[in-house]
Amino acid sequence: MSVAGLKKQFYKASQLVSEKVGGAEGTKLDDDFKEMEKKVDVTSKAVTEVLARTIEYLQPNPASRAKLTMLNTVSKIRGQVKNPGYPQSEGLLGECMIRHGKELGGESNFGDALLDAGESMKRLAEVKDSLDIEVKQNFIDPLQNLCEKDLKEIQHHLKKLEGRRLDFDYKKKRQGKIPDEELRQALEKFEESKEVAETSMHNLLETDIEQVSQLSALVDAQLDYHRQAVQILDELAEKLKRRMREASSRPKREYKPKPREPFDLGEPEQSNGGFPCTTAPKIAASSSFRSSDKPIRTPSRSMPPLDQPSCKALYDFEPENDGELGFHEGDVITLTNQIDENWYEGMLDGQSGFFPLSYVEVLVPLPQ
């Protein structure tokens, strides 16, 4: 920084201290300017909070949001173009229904109904994904651009104006001790900054119809989503009602138990006391199995050497997104990296991926 720049910083700091501590009066801005500044500040707060709440509305699960952010960051680091999307709750419900519907089989009314409902839930998830994309392009991105460009630029002009005001007030207080030309230049710069800040705030407030247009795009996207969702659910409801009608029209199958096979107790034998008795069944002794023997559980996967970083799975973990590593309770996983305080990266049976720290117990920690 030049000597002139250092002097200017000193002037501003000195004037600020005299106002904050000494109670000195600074140059007052007009009421119209203050009113515009207040409206811009309220607009900035409104846009920031509406953005955050909109993202929560589209992606309500905070854990999934954090996980998605982490995976997207890792994808960027690895140069992967395709990023995993937010796991919609409708899609997860649909996958669950389809899985159990297939297990129950085609002869089960409930199984067939679960398959119908599962397919509809997956369609709802696809429609929700379309809503996410539409809202991001036409509402979230424009508002973020407003925050990062227009509002940020206004804050820059206001900060510059405040600095030039402090410089002007300091020199005005020392009038007679500094050249008049220096005081005149300070006043011109202050008025110039005030005009620039005023113009930028005026332009923002006068073009707020753009934000109305973006809000309208959000509502249109929601309407389109709900229309499609209603259509999908109407179709599903009709399918289920048809299944109920078909099931009620079919004759009920009566349960017929199988005939019992006769059980032969054999001829009774007389004991010395004259009472009948039956011979107790003999238990064959075997060297390969005794009652005290217990089945030995063998690990389902190969274990890494214990001299390298590793951990043991405490619970089963089913991967939900690309890049995650699935495992079963008791598996020993080789640790390769710690992504953050909640996620590890590791290898198991030649496959690499990410998994939550809370699902494992560290056996050999990663080197610091």
UniProtKB/Swiss-Prot annotation:
Subunit structure: Interacts with ARC. Interacts with SYNJ1 and DNM1. Interacts with PDCD6IP. Interacts with BIN2.
Location of the region described as Membrane-binding amphipathic helix in the Swiss-Prot/TrEMBL record: 1-21
Top-rank lineage group of the source organism: Eukaryota
Matching InterPro entries: AH/BAR_dom_sf, BAR_dom, Endophilin_A_SH3, Endophilin_SH3RF, SH3-like_dom_sf, SH3_domain
Pfam family, one: SH3_1
Distribution of this protein across tissues and organs: Ubiquitous. Higher expression in pancreas, placenta, prostate, testis and uterus.
Domain-level remarks: An N-terminal amphipathic helix, the BAR domain and a second amphipathic helix inserted into helix 1 of the BAR domain (N-BAR domain) induce membrane curvature and bind curved membranes.
Family: Belongs to the endophilin family.
Residues the record marks as site: Breakpoint for translocation to form KMT2A/MLL1-EEN oncogene: Q15, L16
GO cellular component, one term: cytoplasm
Task of the protein: Implicated in endocytosis. May recruit other proteins to membranes with high curvature.
Native organism: Homo sapiens (Human)
Record's bilayer topology term: Peripheral membrane protein
Region (Required for dimerization upon membrane association): 60-87
Residue span, SH3 domain: 306-365
Residues modified to Phosphothreonine: T298
Disease: In some cases of acute leukemia, a translocation results in the formation of a KMT2A/MLL1-EEN fusion gene.
Start and end residues of each stretch annotated as Interaction with ARC: 218-254
Compartmental location: Cytoplasm; Early endosome membrane; Cell projection, Podosome
Protein name stated in the entry: Endophilin-A2
Coiled coil feature spans: 145-250
Entry GO MF terms: cadherin binding; identical protein binding; lipid binding
